[in-house]
């Protein structure tokens, strides 16, 4: 391997962004990851819940992003801290169709934020995805739920922390392009 090859590989690695996808079980994390992937890499045979973690790489606007899809089952949550080393972004996925789980998901996020070794919001950009918008038929109810979550997030995070909020559907793909854009922008914010 020549020196130029080594330099090129290092430049690619330097541009690589590590992004964790976290949230409660069945919030649609794996489905969102699947939609973020190029069409020829998407799984169209049905998405299974993640046990442990899965890593996928994709290129968005000349930036290589390593997506770490971490399982959200209650038994896996205590291990989430172990994944934050060298992480530039976190996507926190909320199932907006199940308002009865808002308290649980916000409590888990609060506990994660309060462990300051993660540096969430400072060294690690935060994107909160309100997923499954396609399952809330009443658009005024969807708007109300989004405002509720946004209000709660403002209470969780310090005012100097920038949070991106994205509404999408991992199934229909609505909002996925916006998520791609926010992901790249957030990663530049932390560099």
From Swiss-Prot:
Q: Name one Pfam family in it.
A: Arf
Q: Identify the PROSITE patterns for this entry.
A: ARF
Cross-referenced Gene3D superfamilies: P-loop containing nucleotide triphosphate hydrolases
- Keyword NAD part of the UniProt annotation: no
Q: Which InterPro entries match?
A: ARL2/3 (IPR044612), P-loop_NTPase (IPR027417), Small_GTP-bd (IPR005225), Small_GTPase_ARF/SAR (IPR006689)
Name the UniProt key words of this record, in alphabetical order.
GTP-binding, Nucleotide-binding
Molecular-function annotations in GO: GTP binding; GTPase activity
Q: What is any one GO biological process for this UniProt entry?
A: tubulin complex assembly
Q: Does the keyword Repeat apply?
A: no
What does the entry list as the binding residues for GTP? Answer: 23-30, 69-73, 131-134
Annotated GO CC locations: cytoplasm; microtubule cytoskeleton
* Extra remark: Present with 468 molecules/cell in log phase SD medium.
Purpose of the protein = Implicated in yeast microtubule function.
What is the protein name for this chain? GTP-binding protein CIN4
């Amino acid at each position: 391997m020549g020196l130029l090859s080594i330099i090129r590989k290092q430049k690619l690695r330097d541009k690589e962004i590590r992004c964790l996808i976290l949230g409660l079980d069945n919030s649609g994390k794996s489905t969102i990851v699947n939609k973020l992937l190029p069409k020829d890499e998407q799984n169209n045979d049905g998405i299974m819940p993640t046990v442990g973690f899965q890593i996928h790489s994709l290129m968005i606007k000349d930036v290589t992003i390593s997506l770490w899809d971490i399982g959200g089952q209650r038994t896996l949550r205590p291990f989430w801290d172990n994944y934050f080393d060298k992480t530039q972004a976190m996507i926190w996925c909320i199932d907006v169709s199940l308002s009865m789980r808002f308290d649980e998901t916000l409590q888990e996020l609060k506990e994660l934020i309060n462990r300051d070794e993660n540096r969430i919001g400072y060294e690690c950009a935060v994107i909160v995805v309100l997923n499954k918008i396609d399952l809330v038929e009443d658009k005024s109810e969807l708007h109300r739920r989004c405002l509720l979550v946004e209000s709660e997030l403002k209470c969780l995070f310090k005012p100097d922390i920038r949070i991106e909020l994205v509404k999408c559907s991992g199934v229909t793909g609505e909002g996925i392009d916006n998520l791609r854009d926010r992901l790249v922008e957030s990663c530049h914010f932390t560099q």
